[in-house]
Amino acid sequence: MIENLQPLRGMKDLLPNDYQIHNYIINKARDVGALYGYKQMSTPILEYTKVFNRSMGESSDVMSKEIYSFVDKSNNAVALRPEFTSGIIRSFISNGLQHKLPLKFFSTGPVFRYDRPQAGRQRQFHQLNYEYLGAKGAITDAETVKLAVDILKALEIEEDTTLELNSLGCHESRIVYQQKLVEYLNDFKDQLSGESRLRLNKNPMRILDSKSEIDQKIIAHAPILSEYHTNESKKYFDELQKYLDILGIKYSVNPRLVRGLDYYCHTVFEFTTKKLGSQSTILAGGRYDMLSRIMGNYDVHAIGFAAGIERIALMREYKISVIKPVFVLPIGKNNICYALDIVDKLRLQNIVSIIDPIGKIAKRIQRVLNEDAKFIIFIGDEEKMNNNLKFKDLKNQKEYIIDFEKVLELLKQ
C-alpha cells in the first residue's frame, strides 16, 4: 500500500456533487454564449512551450514562475496550458481560419499555474473562456462586456460583483506611458518590494498590480495611463462608455487597472467581489489586437475574457436538482435476468434506473435509502411468474402490485 496517497498540492478531486455544480455553471454559461453566437471548441491541454513564450513573453510572471513545463520523450519543450487565449490563437492560425472571420469561440476546461494554493486559488483550476476574433470597434467591446454581465446574471451572482474597466490606449501610447512609469519608479527603486524591483526592467506595468503596501503607496502617485492616450484612444474609450451607458451597465473606471502582457490594448475589464477575500477577481478580460501579430504575423482584432469556475462556485450555494434513480431489486438469482430486462425498458424511456442484485435484501434497501431514492421495484418469483412488479413509493410508503405500463404511468406523473 502506498502511504499518504493524496493528489498533488493545489490539485483537487472533483467528486460527483462538485461536478454537478461545475456542470451547472458550464451549461448556464454555454447557453448564454450561444445566444450571442459563440460556438464551443477545445484545444489540447498540452502545447509546445513556445506557444506561451511567444504570446506571454518569457519575462512574464506566468512564464518565469508559474508555468508547468517539461521536456517530453521526443525532446520537445511542452507546457500545460496556463490560460486559453494563446491556444485558441494558435488553433486559429494552424487551422487556417483567417478567412472565416469573425469567429466567436467558447471553451472550458482545466488550466494550470504553479502558484501558492489558497481558498479560491489552486494549481489546477477550471475556467469559462470566450474569445471574439475579428472584433472591430468599441461596439464589440461593449457587447463582450454585456455577455459577461448576462452570464453572471444567469449564475445569480451579478449583484455581488462590481465591474471595473480601463483603457490601455493604443500600442504607441502604451510604450510612451511605460517609459514615463519606469522613470517615475526608478526614483523609488530601493523602496520597492523585491518582486517589483525584478519587474521594473522586465515588465514594469505589472508593478501596478502589486499587493505590497509599500508598492501601493508608491503607485498611488505614479503617472496615470490615460494622461498619455492619443486622441484616437480617448475617442475609443468614450465610445465604449457611451455604449455601456445605453445598455444600462453599471461600471467604474479604474485608471490603475492594467494587463502586464504586451499584446493587450484599449479595453480591459474585471468583475470583482468582496465575498472571497483576497481572491476578489471573478471574471477578467480585455482587447488583444496584437496577439495574432506576435504569434503568426496576422492582424486580427480580438477581445475575450475568462472566469474561474471554482470561484463562481464559492460565490453562492447552488442547489442542483438531481434526478432520483429508480432502484430495481431482484430477489433471488432466478429473477436477475427479468430484472435486467425491466431496467433496460426503463432506460429506453429515459428513466434513470439502477439494478442492485447482490447481498441481503435488508442491506440493499438500506443502500437505496442512503441514495435518497423515491421508488423501489422488487422482483421476486411471484412477480416474474405473473409478469408484474412490486412497486414501492418511498415517500408515502405505499406498495402496488402492477404491470410495467402502470409503473411507467406512476413514474412519469
From Swiss-Prot:
One GO CC term on file: cytoplasm
Q: Which GO terms describe its molecular function?
A: ATP binding; histidine-tRNA ligase activity
Report the Pfam families cross-referenced here: HGTP_anticodon (PF03129), tRNA-synt_His (PF13393)
Keywords, A to Z?
Aminoacyl-tRNA synthetase, ATP-binding, Cytoplasm, Ligase, Nucleotide-binding, Protein biosynthesis
Q: Name the domain of life.
A: Bacteria
Q: Where in the cell is it found?
A: Cytoplasm
Q: Which CDD domains match?
A: HisRS-like_core, HisRS_anticodon
Catalytic activity of the protein = tRNA(His) + L-histidine + ATP = L-histidyl-tRNA(His) + AMP + diphosphate + H(+)
Q: What is its EC number?
A: 6.1.1.21
Principal cellular location given in the protein's record: cytoplasm
Q: Does the keyword rRNA-binding apply?
A: no
BP term (GO), one: histidyl-tRNA aminoacylation
Q: Which family does it belong to?
A: Belongs to the class-II aminoacyl-tRNA synthetase family.
Q: How does it assemble?
A: Homodimer.
Protein name from the UniProt record: Histidine--tRNA ligase
Please name the source species: Rickettsia prowazekii (strain Madrid E)
The top of its lineage is: Bacteria, Pseudomonadati, Pseudomonadota, Alphaproteobacteria, Rickettsiales
Q: Which gene encodes it?
A: hisS
